[in-house]
Amino acid sequence: MTDILNLTYEELEAFMTAELGEPRFRARQVWQWLWQKCARSFDEMTNVSKATRARLAEKAVITWPEVETVQKSADGTTKFLLRLADGALVETVLIPSASREGTLRITQCLSCQVGCAMGCTFCSTGTMGFERNMTMGEILGQVLVARAHLGDSRPDHPILRNLVFMGMGEPLLNLNEVMRSLRTLNDEFGLSFSPRRITVSTCGIEKGLRELGESGLAFLAVSLHAPNQEIRKRIMPKAAHWHLDDLITALESYPLKTRERVTFEYLLLGGVNDGIEHARELVRLVSRTKGKLNLIVYNPAEGDPYDAPTPERILAFEQYLWSKNITAIIRKSKGQDIKAACGQLKASELQRGTASAGADAPEA
């Protein structure tokens, strides 16, 4: 059986014509039902003939992730633990904010791998190890779950406004499925997200950077977190295989649109990378590119190997960057009361023994 959510539009068109003997326009109808109307069954596709729906049901399935756990923070952040068809667990987070007009808008943080191979020592997902890549259908299934949860089926005026590939996994190590996902996200007859509303975050893997940039399908964010190679080796051991100097050199020629900048994510770890000497090194790196900095304050949980930086060090770090004409914004952490950081909810479920593969999952 073909999981139809794993097909690009071109693949769906070929499936409909070759496998079902349908005219090409039928693929467009099915495609819009899948991605714009969030259909979970072929029976919902009321402008498709019953005979065609029956043939679709014989040869294809629509597989959404099942919702295992939902947690909502006092600040409105909502975290989902999702079970995939093979029992694997991934997380996605909905982060609310208000527009300038005061209307609600949601940013969704997406996972692209089950686990992660990068082994970053400050990240809960990094301690779990890597299981497998997610498919396009599994990646985009997170968006379908979010839209269903929000009652958001209005492509002309959606509540779900922005998508960030900053959940579990390294996008550039699953480049093929991530790129397939981005094309469907950008498709005006698909999920219809503007590239300006999508950000792909990488630990700094050079391979795939240029392909992502030349595609124009999303903005780029780089999880930097270290001002020099020595600290990078210590806190991001796998990412350190790609030297910082080589990464910055690659970013110097990264294709950017007018007024577009690379966003550098920098997690402030108390006593590790939050000193003025680190800020000086950071300026030397970032000033080589058209970049800006998001400063993230580490929020330790019990048993974590790092401490939060003091307010004084945070302020001094930020002010030094601004004094050197580096745009630096302290990003507010949300969902701290529900373990909204990457991998924390899955880790807590595993510790309780409720997330074993193959366990029964409730309906979404």
Curated annotation (Swiss-Prot):
GO CC annotation, single: cytoplasm
GO molecular function, one term: tRNA (adenine(37)-C2)-methyltransferase activity
Enzyme Commission code(s) on record: 2.1.1.192
Chemical reaction(s) catalysed: adenosine(2503) in 23S rRNA + 2 reduced [2Fe-2S]-[ferredoxin] + 2 S-adenosyl-L-methionine = 2-methyladenosine(2503) in 23S rRNA + 5'-deoxyadenosine + L-methionine + 2 oxidized [2Fe-2S]-[ferredoxin] + S-adenosyl-L-homocysteine; adenosine(37) in tRNA + 2 reduced [2Fe-2S]-[ferredoxin] + 2 S-adenosyl-L-methionine = 2-methyladenosine(37) in tRNA + 5'-deoxyadenosine + L-methionine + 2 oxidized [2Fe-2S]-[ferredoxin] + S-adenosyl-L-homocysteine
Family: Belongs to the radical SAM superfamily. RlmN family.
Gene Ontology biological-process annotations: rRNA base methylation; tRNA methylation
Keywords from the named record: 4Fe-4S, Cytoplasm, Disulfide bond, Iron, Iron-sulfur, Metal-binding, Methyltransferase, rRNA processing, S-adenosyl-L-methionine, Transferase, tRNA processing
Start and end residues of each Radical SAM core domain: 102-337
Binding positions for [4Fe-4S] cluster per the UniProt entry: 116, 120, 123
Pfam hit, one: RlmN_N
Cofactor requirement: [4Fe-4S] cluster
Protein name: Dual-specificity RNA methyltransferase RlmN
Protein function: Specifically methylates position 2 of adenine 2503 in 23S rRNA and position 2 of adenine 37 in tRNAs. m2A2503 modification seems to play a crucial role in the proofreading step occurring at the peptidyl transferase center and thus would serve to optimize ribosomal fidelity.
Localization in the cell: Cytoplasm
Cysteines engaged in disulfide bonds, as pairs: 109-342
Signal peptide extent: none
Main location: cytoplasm
Co-factor note (free text): Binds 1 [4Fe-4S] cluster. The cluster is coordinated with 3 cysteines and an exchangeable S-adenosyl-L-methionine.
Catalytic center residues: 91, 342
Positions with a binding annotation for S-adenosyl-L-methionine: 169-170, 201, 223-225, 299
HAMAP family named in the record: RNA_methyltr_RlmN
Further information: Reaction proceeds by a ping-pong mechanism involving intermediate methylation of a conserved cysteine residue.
Native source species: Nitratidesulfovibrio vulgaris (strain ATCC 29579 / DSM 644 / CCUG 34227 / NCIMB 8303 / VKM B-1760 / Hildenborough)
